[in-house]
UniProtKB/Swiss-Prot annotation:
Presence of the UniProt keyword tRNA processing in the record: yes
Entries under Gene3D superfamilies matching the protein: Adenine nucleotide alpha hydrolases-like domains (2.30.30.280), HUPs (3.40.50.620), Translation factors (2.40.30.10)
The protein's enzyme class: transferase
EC number of the protein: 2.8.1.13
Region (Interaction with target base in tRNA): 122-124
Catalyzed reactions per annotation: S-sulfanyl-L-cysteinyl-[protein] + uridine(34) in tRNA + AH2 + ATP = 2-thiouridine(34) in tRNA + L-cysteinyl-[protein] + A + AMP + diphosphate + H(+)
Name of the molecule in the record: tRNA-specific 2-thiouridylase MnmA
Subcellular location: Cytoplasm
InterPro entries per UniProt: MnmA-like (IPR004506), MnmA-like_C (IPR046885), MnmA-like_central (IPR046884), MnmA-like_central_sf (IPR023382), Rossmann-like_a/b/a_fold (IPR014729)
GO molecular function ontology, one term from the record: ATP binding
Main location: cytoplasm
Stretches the record annotates as Interaction with tRNA: 173-175, 334-335
Length: 384
C-alpha cells in the first residue's frame, strides 16, 4: 500500500503478525466487532448498521493481492480509499492489514494447481474459508473482538449450541454457496448483518447514511483478476499448450490455445462457427482429454454429453458438527443456479455422490457442489 494511503488520519497499515493493537475492553455491554471492509456498499452498510446499534466497531481492509497493484485493472487502492471514506463517515477506526502472503500460500497456489490440471476452481470459496474466516478471524481475535462481521448475504441461526448457516432472505443475492466450507468454530465467531435485508434496501440505507459507496458497482469475477482479461492473467503464471478441438468421435474441428483457458459448457471464445458439420448449432465445451491435450466440443446446448444425472465430490466440508445422513436434499453445482433436488449417497473414504432428479447441465470438475436442507447450508465438496 502506498504512502498516500498509509498517511490517512485514523488509519493504520500493518503486516499480519506485526503491530497488533492492544485495545482496552469497553465498559459497556456492547460487543467489539471487527468488520471486513472491502470498499463496497455491502461492507459499508454492515459497519454502519453495527455502529448504529451501539457496538464498538473496528474496520479492517484486507489487502490480499499485491503483485500488480499499479496496473490498470487493479482497484485495490481505490477500494481502500473508499473504505477509509466510509470509516470516516461512520466514525470508526480502520486498519489496512496485509494478508497477501497467506492468500498466495493458501488460495492462489491452489488456484494455479487446479487450472494446470485442467479443472476450474472457485478461489472465492477457499478465500472465505482460509482468509476471511481464518487469517482475518485470527487477527480480529487478537484485537479482542467478540466476533467478526462481513457484508455477505447469508444468515446464521444458533440453536442449542449449534450454529446453522442459512440462505439470505434475498435469495437472488444469497452467498451461502461461497461460505459452505465454514465450520462451527468459524460460524460461532461470525455475524452477517445483511442476511435479513434485500440488496435494494442496502443501497437505500447507504444513500440515507451518506456513504460514498451507495452507488458503487458490485465487484464481479475472481477477486485478484478483477476486470482484466482472464487469459492474459493466466498466461503470466502458467505455460500455454495449444492442441486440437475434436468432436466426441475424434473429428478435428479447430485448435485450442490451452486446456486451462476453457471450462465445461463454455460457448464464447471457441472461434469455430456453427456450420462445421452442417447443422448450424453453436459449439460448447463438453470435456477435456488431458493426456491427449484435446478439447472435446459438441453442438447444441442440450447435447447428451452436457447433461449428467450424477456427480461425485471429494474434499468434503460440513457446516454442522456431523456429516449429513444419506437421503433427499437439494444442491447447487455452481453459483446462481436454482436448487436441484438430489439424493446424497453414503460417504465413503471422504467421498460422496449426488444423484439428481433432473440431469444437470455442464457439471464442472473443480467447482463446488453445495448441499442444502431447505434454507440450511449443510456443506459440500469439490466436483471430481
Amino acid at each position: 500500500m502506498d504512502e498516500g494511503i498509509r498517511a490517512s488520519g485514523g488509519i493504520r497499515a500493518c503486516q499480519t503478525g506485526k503491530q497488533k493493537q492492544g485495545r482496552k475492553r469497553p465498559v459497556t455491554g456492547k460487543k467489539r466487532i471487527v468488520v471486513g471492509m472491502s470498499g463496497g456498499v455491502d461492507s459499508s452498510v454492515t459497519a454502519w448498521l453495527l455502529k448504529q446499534q451501539g457496538h464498538e466497531v473496528i474496520g479492517v481492509f484486507m489487502q490480499n493481492w499485491e503483485d500488480d497493484n499499479d496496473d490498470e485493472y487493479c482497484s485495490i487502492k481505490q477500494d481502500a480509499l473508499d473504505a477509509m471514506s466510509v470509516a470516516d463517515i461512520v466514525g470508526i477506526d480502520m486498519e489496512i492489514v496485509n494478508f497477501a502472503k497467506e492468500y498466495k500460500d493458501r488460495v492462489f497456489s491452489y488456484f494455479l494447481k487446479e487450472y494446470s490440471a485442467g479443472r476450474t476452481p472457485n478461489p472465492d470459496v477457499l478465500c472465505n474459508a482460509e482468509i476471511k474466516f481464518k487469517a482475518f478471524l485470527d487477527y480480529a481475535m487478537e484485537l479482542g473482538a467478540d466476533c467478526i462481521a462481513t457484508g455477505h448475504y447469508a444468515r446464521k441461526l444458533e440453536q442449542d449450541g449449534t450454529h446453522y448457516l442459512m440462505k439470505a432472505v434475498d435469495h437472488t443475492k444469497d452467498q451461502s454457496y461461497f461460505l459452505y466450507r465454514l465450520q462451527q468454530h468459524q460460524l460461532a465467531k461470525a455475524i452477517f448483518p445483511l442476511g435479513d435485508i434485500r440488496k435494494t434496501e442496502v443501497r437505500r440505507l447507504a444513500e440515507e447514511a451518506g456513504l460514498p459507496t451507495a452507488a458503487k458497482k458490485d465487484s464481479t469475477g475472481i477477486c485478484f483478476i478483477g476486470e482484466r482479461p482472464f487469459r492474459e492473467f493466466l498466461q503470466r503464471y502458467l505455460p500455454t499448450s495449444p492442441g486440437q478441438m475434436v468432436t466426441p468421435d475424434g473429428k478435428v474441428v479447430g485448435e485450442h490455445i490451452g486446456l486451462m483457458y476453457y471450462t465445461l459448457g463454455q460457448r464464447k471464445g471457441l472461434t469455430i462457427g456453427g456450420s462445421r458439420d452442417g447443422n448450424g448449432e453453436p459449439w460448447f465445451v463438453a470435456g477435456k482429454d488431458i493426456p491427449g491435450n484435446k478439447l472435446i466440443v459438441v453442438q447444441g446446448h442440450d447435447h447428451p454429453l452436457l447433461l449428467k444425472p450424477t456427480l461425485s465430490m471429494a474434499d468434503l466440508s460440513w457446516t454442522l458438527p456431523d456429516a449429513p445422513a444419506p437421503g433427499e436434499y437439494s444442491a447447487k453445482n455452481r453459483y446462481r443456479m436454482a436448487d436441484a433436488a438430489c439424493t446424497l449417497s453414503p460417504i465413503v473414504d471422504g467421498q460422496a455422490s449426488l444423484t439428481f432428479q433432473e440431469k444437470q447441465w455442464a457439471v464442472t470438475p473443480g467447482q463446488s457442489a453445495v448441499l442444502y436442507h431447505g434454507d440450511i447450508c449443510l456443506g459440500g465438496g469439490i466436483i471430481q
